[in-house]
Regions:
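Metal-dependent phosphoesterase/phosphodiesterase active-site architecture
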Residues: 50-96, 101-109, 113-134, 138, ...
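Active-site environment of divalent metal-dependent phosphoester hydrolases
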Residues: 29-40, 106-108, 148-155, 159, ...
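Structural recognition of the beta-strand scaffold that forms the well-ordered cores
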Residues: 26-31, 35-38, 88-90, 96-100, ...
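Short, electropositive alpha-helical surface patch
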Residues: 14-15, 41-59, 155-169, 197-201
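Core catalytic region of metal-dependent phosphoesterases/phosphodiesterases
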Residues: 1-53
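Active-site-proximal segments of metal-dependent phosphoesterases and phosphodiesterases across multiple
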Residues: 107-126, 133-181, 191
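Histidine/cysteine- and/or acidic
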Residues: 13-30, 161-180, 185, 197-221
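Short, glycine/acidic-rich beta->alpha junctions
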Residues: 6-12, 81, 157-161, 225
Length: 374
């Protein structure tokens, strides 16, 4: 049973643990669908009869914890209370991190269906736009962080908010260095392309039109038959773009030993070493990213940006063994992950990777979005 006391206790314990082991780091908090009681619920501020305040205890708790741990000041705390647990912060000069409560577009949040024709009843996306405009005006780069992904197979979010987000990301793509989401417990990504909306009829998913991308990170929690995992990003300190990342995992078959030794984290793969060879698509005339390759390989000086990941989907089309490898890494080398070795699976995976809105994802072939066994 998930109660308010349990949520508060969990948040306090987790934040204290982070602060203990990384006392000089600024932790960025992004609330997910299990960070409320009941789960999956976030109420927008325009509800009548006090209904909008039923989750205010959660925002108040997070605001107090962020301040007490030294990760924000009074201004940060007020933003958290105002924006449903979301806030913006500048941990380094030239970088603005914007945390969103993505339960506002979560398909399982019952309040998402009130005023459903309005893409932003909570005004969260308006606030995001204001933050991105301020970042643009101040020549800052922005990271967007959240829990529920806006796209992939279309099963987690609703259409109107993620269509509006698509337009916002397209407008501010030069300001947004990267976006980071989770929720699925799996290793995935998706790309935004130039578009005024996330509707399938308006998006030309061509690599030369790639504008932004989102890392959908795997989880430490194994959930259903995937191995625990954690990721270390290697970031350019001036542009705040990701140059590489290292993915670590631990095998669950060692679980009985963990109470004596703790988990042993092994390197599973590095993104650049694994995915930066585009020689086959270049040879076949299908490489169209605006970056000149070096002997068929993505230059070491170039970031792993939207063009990189869009070009990777083109390379996967001509080298489907890369899709199979991505499928293996999606479950972090889990023996329980199903193979992706059919034309139907290949086409579905490529479609998901090119779908950064719910609408786009739902127009992809269904049934191949997850590697977990439920």
């Amino acid at each position: 049973h998930i109660s308010q006391d349990l949520v508060k206790y969990s948040e306090q314990s987790l934040f204290d643990l982070f602060h203990k082991h990384a006392p000089n780091a600024t932790m960025i908090v992004a609330l997910g669908n299990h960070d409320s009681a009941p789960s999956d619920v976030a109420a927008p501020s325009n509800l009548p009869d006090g209904l909008a305040d039923q989750l205010s205890w959660d925002w108040d708790n997070v605001a107090a914890l962020v301040k007490s741990e030294g990760w924000g000041d009074n201004v940060t705390s007020e933003k958290i209370r105002t924006h449903y647990g979301g806030y913006s912060i500048s941990p380094r000069q030239g970088l603005r991190v914007i945390s969103l409560n993505t339960d506002m577009w979560y398909r399982n949040n019952p309040f998402s269906y009130l005023n459903i024709d309005n893409p932003d009843p909570s005004h969260m996306l308006r606030w995001l736009t204001d933050e991105l405009q301020a970042a643009e005006d101040n020549n800052e780069r922005a990271w967007i962080v959240g829990h529920v992904l806006p796209g992939w197979d279309g099963g987690d979010s609703i259409d109107n908010p993620t269509n509006l987000l698509y337009h916002i990301v397209s407008r501010f793509s030069h300001t947004i260095a990267h976006s980071f989401f989770g929720h699925k417990h799996e290793d995935m990504f998706h790309v935004w392309y130039e578009s005024q909306s996330g509707n399938s009829s308006s998006v030309s998913r061509k690599t030369q039109n790639a504008r932004a991308m989102a890392f959908i990170g795997p989880s430490i929690t194994p959930l259903h038959n995937v191995n625990p995992s954690l990721r270390v990003y290697h970031v350019d300190p001036e542009t705040y773009e990701v140059m590489d990342y290292s993915q670590y995992y631990t095998q669950l078959y060692n679980f009985e030993k963990l109470n004596k030794t703790g988990p042993v984290w092994e390197l599973l793969y590095k993104a650049r070493d694994t995915y930066s060879n585009f020689s086959m698509s270049e040879k076949q005339g299908k490489y169209t990213a605006p970056v000149r390759l070096e002997n068929g390989t993505w230059p070491k000086s170039a970031p792993l940006n939207a063009s990189f990941w869009a070009a990777l989907t083109d390379e996967m089309e001509v080298r489907p063994e890369l899709i199979q490898l991505h499928q293996l890494y999606q479950g972090r080398n889990s023996p329980k992950s199903p193979a992706c070795d059919t034309k139907e699976c290949y086409e579905a995976k490529l479609c998901y990777m090119r779908s950064a809105s719910s609408n786009l994802g739902r127009h992809c072939p269904s049934g191949f979005g997850s590697v977990q066994s439920f």
